[in-house]
Swiss-Prot record:
Residues 1-10 have a biased composition (Basic residues). Residues 1-46 are annotated as: Disordered. Its main location: nucleus. Belongs to the BRX1 family. GO terms for molecular function: RNA binding; rRNA binding. GO terms for biological process: ribosomal large subunit assembly; rRNA processing. It comes from the Eukaryota. Residues 60-249 form the Brix domain. It comes from Homo sapiens. The keyword Acetylation applies. The modification N6-acetyllysine is found at residue 276. This is Ribosome biogenesis protein BRX1 homolog.
Length: 353
C-alpha cells in the first residue's frame, strides 16, 4: 500500500499575504510635499545637544561642604561655588566634635579626590581648607571680605556649567609655597574637559591675585565682541595660615609669618580703645587738679591802663513818685468778655422765667 500524503488543514495551500501599500505613497503628491516641509521645519527648530568629540579622562571630583555654625553669607558662598563648579559634590554639615581626618573617609565614600571645607569658629571667623585627599597636601586659609552673588548684583553673567579660564598672578611662580598653591588651585577650580555636567563653552575667567600677602579671588565674564571683562562674583580673600604635607594634618611645610589670628586682631583693637579711654581720663584728672590749685595773683601793671579812656559819669536820678502800673490789654479784654457773658446769661434766664 502506497503511503498517502497528509493534506494540510482545510485542504488549501496557504498563500502569502500581499504587502500593504504605504500610507505616504497613497497620499497625493501635494500633501506629501507639505508633510516633508513640516518635518524639515521641526528639524530646523530643534536645538541639538552638545556634541562630545572626546572622552572624559580627568575624573576630578570636588567635595564642598562645611561645619555646623556657619552664617548665611558662608552658606550662600558655598552655593555659589557649587553652581560655578559642575564637577563638585555636596554633603551634610559635619559636627564640631569630629576630627578633621574624618573628612578623608567622607571623600572616599563620595568618590571625591579634592575637598573644599569651610570651618566656622565663634560664629564670626571662617576658615577654608583646600585638600588633596587622601595623601595631601592641604592648605588652611582665613576667609575675609566675603561678597556673594546675590549681594553684589553685578552686570556680568555666564552660562551655568561652562568651563572657566584660570588666571594667576606672576607672583605665584616666584616663591615655592605659592607654586604649590597654584597647582592645588588649578586642580580644584578647573572644570575637567568633557565632563558630563559641563558645557563646551569658555565664557568666564577665575582670577587669583596676590596683594598684601593675601590671595584675592574674582570671577569675570568674557564678552565676545571686544574681549572685555565684566565682573560676575562672588568675591573673597584668602589669608594663608599653614600648608601641611598630609590631608588635613601632618608635618607643616610652610607657615605664614605675616598671619595674625582674629583673636589677636580683636585683642589689639580692644587695647587701642582702652588706651584712648585711659588717656581721656588722665586729661580729665589733670584738668580737675588745675582747677583745685590756688590762683596766683599777678601784680598790677601800670602800663595796662595807658589806652583806657574813662567814660562820662551820668547824674544819679532819684525817683520819689511810684510809677504808674502798666495796663495789660489782654487781661482787660478778658474781663470785659466775662462781664458781657454773665449779663447775657442773666438776661436769658429772666426770659425763660
Amino acid at each position: 500500500m502506497a503511503a498517502t500524503k497528509r493534506k494540510r488543514r482545510g485542504g488549501f495551500a496557504v498563500q502569502a499575504k500581499k504587502p500593504k501599500r504605504n500610507e505616504i505613497d497613497a497620499e497625493p503628491p501635494a500633501k506629501r510635499h507639505a508633510t516633508a516641509e513640516e518635518v524639515e521645519e521641526e528639524e530646523r527648530d530643534r536645538i541639538p545637544g552638545p556634541v562630545c568629540k572626546g572622552k572624559w579622562k580627568n575624573k576630578e571630583r570636588i567635595l564642598i561642604f562645611s561645619s555646623r555654625g556657619i552664617n548665611f553669607r558662608t552658606r550662600h558662598l558655598m552655593q555659589d561655588l557649587r553652581m560655578l563648579m559642575p564637577h563638585s559634590k555636596a554633603d551634610t554639615k559635619m559636627d564640631r566634635k569630629d576630627k578633621l581626618f574624618v573628612i578623608n573617609e567622607v571623600c572616599e565614600m563620595k568618590n571625591c579626590n579634592k575637598c573644599i571645607y569651610f570651618e566656622a569658629k565663634k560664629k564670626q571667623d571662617l576658615y577654608m581648607w583646600l585638600s588633596n585627599s587622601p595623601h595631601g597636601p592641604s592648605a588652611k586659609f582665613l576667609v575675609q571680605n566675603i561678597h556673594t552673588l546675590a549681594e553684589l548684583k553685578m552686570t556680568g553673567n555666564c552660562l551655568k556649567g561652562s568651563r572657566p579660564l584660570l588666571s594667576f598672578d606672576p607672583a605665584f611662580d616666584e616663591l615655592p609655597h605659592y607654586a604649590l598653591l597654584k597647582e592645588l588651585l588649578i586642580q580644584i577650580f578647573s572644570t575637567p574637559r568633557y565632563h558630563p555636567k559641563s558645557q563646551p563653552f569658555v565664557d568666564h575667567v577665575f582670577t587669583f591675585t596676590i596683594l598684601d600677602n593675601r590671595i584675592w579671588f574674582r570671577n569675570f565674564q568674557i564678552i565676545e565682541e571686544d574681549a572685555a571683562l565684566v565682573e560676575i562674583g562672588p568675591r573673597f580673600v584668602l589669608n594663608l595660615i599653614k600648608i601641611f604635607q598630609g590631608s588635613f594634618g601632618g608635618p607643616t611645610l610652610y607657615e605664614n609669618p605675616h598671619y595674625q589670628s582674629p583673636n589677636m586682631h580683636r585683642r589689639v583693637i580692644r587695647s587701642i580703645t582702652a588706651a584712648k579711654y585711659r588717656e581721656k581720663q588722665q586729661v580729665k584728672d589733670v584738668q580737675k587738679l588745675r582747677k583745685k590749685e590756688p590762683k596766683t595773683l599777678l601784680p598790677h601793671d601800670p602800663t595796662a591802663d595807658v589806652f583806657v579812656t574813662p567814660a562820662e559819669e551820668k547824674p544819679i536820678e532819684i525817683q520819689w513818685v511810684k510809677p504808674e502800673p502798666k495796663v495789660d490789654l489782654k487781661a482787660r479784654k478778658k474781663r470785659i468778655y466775662k462781664r458781657q457773658r454773665k449779663m447775657k446769661q442773666r438776661m436769658d434766664s429772666g426770659k425763660t422765667k
